[in-house]
Amino acid sequence: MARYRGPRVKIVRRLGELPGLTTKIPNRNYPAGQHGPSSGMTKMSQYRVRLQEKQKLRYNYGVSEKQLLSYVRRARRMKGPTGELLLQMLEMRLDAVVYRLGFAPTIRAARQYVSHGLVTVNGQAVTIPSYQCSVGEVIKSNSAPIVEHAKTFGGVVPSHLSVDKNNATGKVERNVTRSQIGLTVNELLIIEFYSRK
């Protein structure tokens, strides 16, 4: 299955705030659908809780099920806490770094900027949104929309990144830690969800 292209506010209403998916804010605070307002009365199963946590991660970072499973398997092979390593790998993707630097309003927009060749890494054009950024790499763009958004960006840039808003240039200073990730998700439930795969 390809990336999700459907209504984004519906997903936000169901799963909660996803800053990488959309900047829109839903008018209603209950899930969409015929049984939306009354669905809060039912007890959520253990499977549903884990599935929703996984879906939060998928929709926020715009990755497919196959990609997320690949990231989980790669995180399992690495030394350290699997959940934190998974989030670190997702957060160090080029599209996520471009979004965190304030060059794009959402990760989806950052993905499009990268795939259209508007972003360079260490002076080389990179058109792969899943490119894993490493410490010391410089991300730059000369595109007018990106430079304009970077200048007007009012959000907080995480401390593992440094940014020059006037030149639309950013640098990865160090690896991201769990406290610097702006997504409220329980990564242990995601690892438990994938424990049988």
UniProtKB/Swiss-Prot annotation:
Keywords: Chloroplast, Plastid, Ribonucleoprotein, Ribosomal protein, RNA-binding, rRNA-binding. The keyword Cell inner membrane does not apply. One of its GO terms (cellular component) is small ribosomal subunit. The keyword Acetylation does not apply. CDD domains: S4. Gene3D superfamilies: Ribosomal Protein S4 Delta 41, Chain A, domain 1, RNA-binding S4 domain. GO terms for biological process: ribosomal small subunit biogenesis; translation. Pfam families: Ribosomal_S4, S4. It comes from the Eukaryota. InterPro entries: Ribosomal_uS4, Ribosomal_uS4_bac-type, Ribosomal_uS4_N, S4_RNA-bd, S4_RNA-bd_sf. PROSITE patterns: S4. One of its GO terms (molecular function) is structural constituent of ribosome. One of the primary rRNA binding proteins, it binds directly to 16S rRNA where it nucleates assembly of the body of the 30S subunit. With S5 and S12 plays an important role in translational accuracy. This is Small ribosomal subunit protein uS4c. It is found in: Plastid, Chloroplast. Part of the 30S ribosomal subunit. Contacts protein S5. The interaction surface between S4 and S5 is involved in control of translational fidelity. Residues 92-153 form the S4 RNA-binding domain. Belongs to the universal ribosomal protein uS4 family.
